Amino acid sequence: MTSPTVWRAATGALMALALAPISVEATITSVTVNASRSCENAAGYTCADITVHGSVARADGSAGVYVVPAVLIYPRHHRANRVGVVDWVNSAFFHFFPPTTEFGTFQFTLLATGHYLFDEGYTYVSIQWDKAVTEIFGPTAPVDGLPHNHLVYGSIDRSADAWEILLDAARLLKDPSLYPDSNGPRPVETVLSSGYSQGAGAQLELLAEGLDPHLVYDGHLIQMIGLACFKRDDVAPHFGFFGDCSPLPRNGRHAPVIVLATESDMVIFHPTVLGFGKSAFFTRNPTDPNWRQYEIAGISHLPEPILPLGLPNQNTGDPRPVFRAALENLTRWTKGTHRAGPPPSRYFSGSVDANDVFVPVTDADGHFAGGVRLPHVESTLHGRPAGAPLGRHTPLNPLGLDPFNPFVFISGTFTRFSDEELLERYPSRDQYVRRVVRAADHLSARGYITNADRMALIAAAECEPLPEDSPCPK
């Protein structure tokens, strides 16, 4: 595995070679349905592997074409809520590790929200936009009888054509007339972008460089990132990498934005850690009326509930309730004529030093103070304790240091309290559950989690294995 020092040097070289984004216009010319079926895990939905064919007319007078894979999941039988989500598929694996497998793409919007999208009637598409991936695997999957990852095969002329590919995905959801099946998706009214880590860096680049001037996207859910933009250039093999961002918009003249950040994202994005970017402290945008940022305590960049890595100590904090609520709030903020703003931003307590390193204030358990406090960390509400931690959650995992594995490093750790400490904290299950209820009720009432997740958190607390071993209610 490559060391952080080598990655910092490589990143610096890539940033030095980066080109300014090119203003382009694109057109979808056709859509091919490669496979279509009823979704196994989404009742009333069709899952389709498709290929999107498009042309690009660039500002420099040149023209190009792209042929990229996508996964489209759409509701049947009038179940649609007329909102689409474009998942900016994450291919960071191929920028950090040798391409020993095709299965290094991650549809993090699905991983982070579970069945929520399909319970609520959203239309979903994830699309490949990273030229580095299509250059590795080529235009089409081999016909060899083996399983292949549809999302890695395609062709992109220029790396910066990515922006129009991503805009075209939104356009396709709003106008699916080129879809060749008469039972295809219905048009949506509102389209949200959703990116996680690498995808989130691309979203920040789109906003910082004004690459969606006509607001094809109606809103952006930007997850697990610091101030680091994913750049596009035509230098192989990466065709761009994380780099410094231009100033983010501050005046609200952009589609609404919700940013989700974790303890990891406050500290890993720095030249001395991952080798690029700045802390998520610098993506805070408190004067912009169209920007919210929620910083989630006790959560790592890659927690086990979203992406289990098979580690003995990976951070077990579950941020998915916050992700689902953020998506619901962004929908209400952007859909229809009667729109509702999301809850206020929630920041960690702390500051940055002279080197732009975030220095957090921590609680008695070592979790970052402030922010959105799910029941797995402690808080105080109206002078009473809320939340019931079962151990210490950290943002970084030392197992990822030698040899350096960035995925492991940013997965964080969890160390459970001893039985003696748990009994001292919660002499009875009733006391434990009351504290979870207090935290969950507070978060739900203020819109930071949904009511469905409030009930699920309470139900889980009632059956959490505790040293006193009281029976789980039926």
Regions found by a protein language model. Name each.
Residues 1, 25-26:
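Intrinsically disordered, low-complexity proline-rich regions
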Residues 1-11:
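Bacterial N-terminal signal peptides that target proteins for export
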Residues 6, 22-24:
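Short hydrophobic transmembrane-like helices used for membrane targeting/insertion
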Residues 11-21:
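Bacterial N-terminal signal peptides
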Residues 26-474:
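C-terminal His-loop and adjacent cap/lid subdomain of alpha/beta-hydrolase
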